[in-house]
Swiss-Prot record:
Record InterPro entries: Ribosomal_Su5_D2-typ_SF (IPR020568), Ribosomal_uS5 (IPR000851), Ribosomal_uS5_bac-type (IPR005712), Ribosomal_uS5_C (IPR005324), Ribosomal_uS5_N (IPR013810), Ribosomal_uS5_N_CS (IPR018192), Ribsml_uS5_D2-typ_fold_subgr (IPR014721)
UniProt subunit comment: Part of the 30S ribosomal subunit. Contacts proteins S4 and S8.
Molecular functions per Gene Ontology: rRNA binding; structural constituent of ribosome
Protein name according to UniProt: Small ribosomal subunit protein uS5
Role played: With S4 and S12 plays an important role in translational accuracy.
Keywords: Ribonucleoprotein, Ribosomal protein, RNA-binding, rRNA-binding
């Protein structure tokens, strides 16, 4: 996998999306204690995306912590004409994700947690399928893993030492 981490977030205009919020109950001798866990995806809708998990006693604090964690976990994704350059399969835990490029006008054909990640990165046309676990934690991580493994045609051509046209035509 190529080094596609984003170093600085100062000049980026990141938009955050809440994927899931989970109320956790801890039973103690004195009664029940409630806390919240929030999965957040941030992206600039131009090829940069990240995810974070925030935990706190209040929902708003958990979301804020998730956003800060997501800003520390950004990757660069090659987006070409609103779609991805090639098909990609990735797994995380019990979740398996397949993302495929789609022609212009198709839209984002993905469900739940995958849709939030794909729209945050700025992909407008893609076909996505999830198998196995539908746990939002694992779906977000598997989708980010699939996007992280994508390579642009220019990178492939440079690694092979051939022209970009040769990559497309074989």
């Amino acid at each position: 996998m190529a080094n596609n981490r984003v170093k600085s977030t100062n000049d980026l205009e990141l938009k955050d999306r809440l994927v899931a919020i989970n109320r956790v109950t801890k039973v103690t001798k004195g009664g029940r204690t409630f806390s919240f866990a929030a999965i957040v995806v941030v992206g600039n809708e131009d090829g940069i995306v990240g995810w974070g998990l925030g935990k706190a006693g209040e929902v708003t604090t958990a979301i804020a912590k998730g956003v800060e964690a997501a800003k520390k976990n950004l990757i660069k994704v090659p987006v070409h004409k609103g779609t991805i350059p090639h098909e990609q399969l990735a797994k995380f835990g019990g979740a398996q994700v397949l993302i495929r490029p789609a022609s212009h006008g198709t839209g984002v054909k993905a469900g739940g947690a995958m849709r939030a990640v794909l729209e945050s990165v700025g992909i407008t046309d893609v076909l996505a399928k999830s198998k196995g676990s539908s746990n939002p934690h694992n779906l977000v991580k598997a989708t980010i893993a699939a996007l992280g493994e994508l390579r642009s045609p220019f990178d492939v051509a440079q690694n092979r030492g051939v022209a970009v046209e040769k990559v497309f035509r074989g």
